[in-house]
Amino acid sequence: MERNKDLTEIVDPERMISFGSSDFEQTVRFYQGSKAQITEQDFVLGSIDQLHRLGVHSSAYNDAVDTMGDLTTAICLLIIDANLMRHANPVRNPGGMLRAMTRQHKAGRLNLIGSLIGLDQKLKRKEWVGEA
């Protein structure tokens, strides 16, 4: 759980949801409701609602949660969602990617912080050139 806390301190949840699709963001906002801030629960529930749209089977999700916890799995789903929209090398098997991320986590080699920093830099470039 300590690692989960570090991730949310590094990337603001408001910024983080802008990395993914508008569907992902709208679903998290639905759970946020009238609250001033997005909570961990809003983020997790919103990501669960994306499983079918992303094509991630519930068994892959459950394995990920059992291994990484709710928040880390939700962040993985956001990263997968964001990478579905890549121009170069888009994710073609989201469920397979989640399973691979789960294996990487088990092996101590999953670098979510690096992925989030990369998505943040990509978003900043889009904002800078007026694409976002």
Where do the model's predicted regions map?
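Electrostatic interaction modules used in gene-expression and signaling proteins
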Residues: M1-A132
